[in-house]
Amino acid sequence: MKVLWAALVVTLLAGCRADVEPEVEVREPAVWQSGQPWELALSRFWDYLRWVQTLSDQVQEELLSNQVTQELTLLIEDTMKEVKAYKAELEKELGPVAEDTKARLAKELQAAQARLGADMEEVRNRLSQYRSEVQAMLGQSSEELRARLTSHPRKMKRRLQRDIDELQKRMAVYKAGAQEGAERGVSAIRERLGSLIEQGRLQALASQPLQERAQAWGEQMRGRLEKVGSQARDRLEEVREQMEEVRVKVEEQAEAFQARLKSWFEPMMEDMRRQWAELIQKVQVAVGASTSAPSQEP
């Protein structure tokens, strides 16, 4: 579409181009047939330039006024507004897309949009410049005026065409990303619905009558208590058996120790009794001898 604008601007700037070179036929892009608001705005921009072209001999007089640049300013603003609105709509559709992908697409589209706006501004500025040149060239011949007005149009046409193609390509990528995001969103919704269905099933189980749940809970607790009681009884029986084994071992060890002590001390006590008896006997003998000696002295 920008190419179309550029071509129109070129022919507009050419003024009375019929005597200089054949009119360049410009084909309207097929993309306008989709009817997007921003494309319709660009179409209006194109229609206005084409209308200016039909002024033929009146072009010089129109360029001397501010009407053309004012109209172009309004059309540029409308076009940029529609492009931004369409971009915002695509951004909403890109919700489920990864943030890095969304940021990259937005950056590329913003750059293409900026280039389009800059070139449209240049078209308007060129017209203002040509209007000033026309004012300065009053009195010159029509051929000289036409030659000045046709100096830049071809370059502007190529630039606008390139920008339009770039913007359309970015829009297509952006829309493809939005469709991909929508598909991911549907998958996420499907998974969410599955989760909600599962939760609903669990809630249905949880909504059983309170009495049934209490009865089930009571049976469960009784089963657990019986299991714990059985385990406790088994454990106590094991402990009792272990204690009995320990008692028997202690008694056996005590009897063995007592027997060892008896085997140690009985010979010793017997020897001490024997020695003590011998000592007493010796003392008695000594005492008896000492008592018999005084009786024999008179």
Curated annotation (Swiss-Prot):
Range of residues in the leader sequence: 1-18
Disulfide bonds: none
Top-level taxon of the source organism: Eukaryota
Amino acids binding heparin: 156-159, 218-225
GO biological process: acylglycerol homeostasis; cholesterol efflux; cholesterol metabolic process; chylomicron remnant clearance; high-density lipoprotein particle assembly; intermediate-density lipoprotein particle clearance; lipoprotein biosynthetic process; melanosome organization
Stretches the record annotates as 8 X 22 AA approximate tandem repeats: 74-244
Keywords: Chylomicron, Endosome, Extracellular matrix, Glycoprotein, HDL, Heparin-binding, Lipid transport, Lipid-binding, Oxidation, Phosphoprotein, Repeat, Secreted, Signal, Transport, VLDL
Location in the cell: Secreted; Secreted, Extracellular space; Secreted, Extracellular space, Extracellular matrix; Extracellular vesicle
The record's account of how the chain is modified after translation: APOE exists as multiple glycosylated and sialylated glycoforms within cells and in plasma. The extent of glycosylation and sialylation are tissue and context specific. Glycated in plasma VLDL.
MF terms in GO: cholesterol transfer activity; heparan sulfate proteoglycan binding; heparin binding; identical protein binding; low-density lipoprotein particle receptor binding; phosphatidylcholine-sterol O-acyltransferase activator activity; phospholipid binding
Residues where Phosphoserine is found: 141
Residue numbers bearing the Methionine sulfoxide modification: 137
Positions of the UniProt region annotated as LDL and other lipoprotein receptors binding: 152-162
Matches recorded under InterPro entries: ApoA_E (IPR000074), Apolipoprotein_A1/A4/E (IPR050163)
Ranges for the Sequence repeats: 74-95, 96-117, 118-139, 140-161, 162-183, 184-204, 205-222, 223-244
Subunit structure: Homotetramer. May interact with ABCA1; functionally associated with ABCA1 in the biogenesis of HDLs. May interact with APP/A4 amyloid-beta peptide; the interaction is extremely stable in vitro but its physiological significance is unclear. May interact with MAPT. May interact with MAP2. In the cerebrospinal fluid, interacts with secreted SORL1. Interacts with PMEL; this allows the loading of PMEL luminal fragment on ILVs to induce fibril nucleation.
Function: APOE is an apolipoprotein, a protein associating with lipid particles, that mainly functions in lipoprotein-mediated lipid transport between organs via the plasma and interstitial fluids. APOE is a core component of plasma lipoproteins and is involved in their production, conversion and clearance. Apolipoproteins are amphipathic molecules that interact both with lipids of the lipoprotein particle core and the aqueous environment of the plasma.
Similarity annotation: Belongs to the apolipoprotein A1/A4/E family.
Protein name as annotated: Apolipoprotein E
Organism: Cavia porcellus
Encoding gene per record: APOE
